[in-house]
Amino acid sequence: MLKIQNLKKSYGKRTILNNVNMNIPKGKVYALIGPNGAGKSTIMKILTGLVSKTSGSIIFEGREWSRRDLRKIGSIIEEPPLYKNLSAYDNMKVVTTMLGVSESTILPLLNKVGLGNIDKRPVKQFSLGMKQRLGIAISLINSPKLLILDEPTNGLDPIGIQELREIIESFKSEGMTIMISSHILSEVEHLADFIGFIYEGKIILEKEYDGSENLEELFNNQILFEKRR
């Protein structure tokens, strides 16, 4: 589905990403894990066209990634850009109209994220968790091949975190390809099929994950190994 080879990103003399290599298989959940400032968001911003790469190769569906592929990628990188005085439905309608997608897709997508039965109240009255779920519904309007979620549970209360986990689990059961980032290992250990540990701008470990290993222990051991190299 997606292969990243020798990806670099620098700002002047400051290197943010240093020869990053990743392989995200189709139909799997790939968890990008690392501390704040490790480079997780930079990778996701490059993949969604928000930031340009310095060098390296990105292969998407068997060919070199280009900006035309952005229509095939749904994403929540920062707080969703919502119209706060409009309802969830009307927010969706704005985007379907802009993209030329049938309005009939709106309610099924709202149901998919647990927002199909809410009233017409404006988004400004929503909790952060509801805004995140609406953002995800909007990101699915174009039927993307890849869904990218950058620390989607950040700032949510326990109820919001659980609701979002259940939604991602339902996407996983449908075979959707998802890339999710987090610095909290417990948030992804039940979701991930593959893990990539990023530390100081480098992928220090990438492997298939079946849930049998303790992620925190695995990550800490890998960091110790890197520091000793």
Swiss-Prot record:
Binding site for ATP: 34-41
InterPro entries listed in its UniProt record: AAA+_ATPase, ABC_Gallidermin_ATP-bd, ABC_transporter-like_ATP-bd, ABC_transporter-like_CS, P-loop_NTPase
Transmembrane segments: none
An annotated GO BP: protein transport
PROSITE patterns: ABC_TRANSPORTER_1, ABC_TRANSPORTER_2
Keyword Coiled coil: no
Keywords: ATP-binding, Bacteriocin transport, Nucleotide-binding, Protein transport, Transport
Record flagged with keyword Acetylation: no
Start and end residues of each ABC transporter domain: 2-225
Database matches in Pfam families: ABC_tran
GO molecular function: ATP binding; ATP hydrolysis activity
SUPFAM superfamilies reported for this sequence: P-loop containing nucleoside triphosphate hydrolases
Function: Implicated in the export process of the lantibiotic SrtA.
Family: Belongs to the ABC transporter superfamily.
Protein name as annotated: Lantibiotic transport ATP-binding protein SrtF
Organism: Streptococcus pyogenes serotype M1
Gene coding for it: srtF
